[in-house]
């Protein structure tokens, strides 16, 4: 049985729901969300102190620090997957264990500035490349080995726009609950 309170903390903007159609307008909006994520994230976290950064967004959840570093880790994987899909014929991508990565020392204790800077450059490149894609490029794909599922680039764009906003909401909702 699901716990609605826990689900609201885990998925503050809801679980990802793919659109019925990946229209040009949807893709443009998703790329805009990706392009603006680093600045929106920075505005929410830049003035937090160490204790706040080390506060989990929910019981047994990641800390704000871990969420920020996870976004860097995850979105680097997105960038590589995008490049593979554009340059190879339906490649099988490498799966990574995000929970294990989140427990590495850099994700646990490193200052957030390097990841904020990484996200700034990475998202510029993501948005730049994504904006250059034509309809045929958006249909190119890769295989994700976790569920042996083929994922098209247009789906990747929608998913990572959601992923950015999903983790940003973890932070903004925690700040609201704590009155920060």
Give the positions of each predicted feature:
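Small-residue-biased structural context
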Residues: 2-6, 24, 33, 47, ...
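Short, contiguous alpha-helical
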Residues: 1-13, 17, 54-100, 139-180
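A generic "alpha-helical surface" signal
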Residues: 28, 32-35, 65, 69, ...
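Acidic/histidine-rich alpha-helical segments that form the ligand environment
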Residues: 32-39, 44, 102-139
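A short secondary-structure junction motif
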Residues: 44, 48-51, 89, 133-136, ...
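Short, contiguous, helix-prone interaction/anchoring segments in small proteins
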Residues: 22-58
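Acidic/His metal-coordination segments adjacent to aromatic residues that form catalytic metal sites
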Residues: 23, 101-114, 146-155
């Amino acid at each position: 049985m699901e716990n609605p309170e826990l689900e609201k903390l885990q998925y503050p903007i809801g679980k990802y729901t793919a659109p019925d159609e990946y229209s040009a307008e949807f893709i443009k909006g998703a790329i805009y969300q990706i392009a603006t994520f680093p600045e929106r994230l920075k505005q929410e976290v830049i003035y937090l102190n160490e204790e706040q950064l080390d506060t989990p967004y929910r019981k047994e959840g990641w800390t704000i620090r871990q969420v920020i570093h996870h976004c860097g880790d995850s979105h680097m994987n997105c960038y590589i997957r995008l490049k593979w899909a554009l340059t190879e014929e339906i490649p099988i991508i490498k799966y990574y264990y995000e929970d294990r990565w989140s427990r590495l020392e850099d994700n646990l204790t490193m200052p957030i500035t390097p990841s904020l800077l990484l996200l700034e450059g990475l998202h510029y490149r993501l948005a730049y490349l994504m904006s250059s894609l034509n309809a045929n490029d958006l249909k190119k794909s890769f295989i994700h080995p976790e569920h042996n599922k083929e994922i098209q680039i247009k789906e990747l764009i929608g998913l990572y726009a959601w992923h950015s906003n999903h983790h940003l909401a973890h932070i903004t909702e925690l700040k609201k609950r704590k009155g920060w």
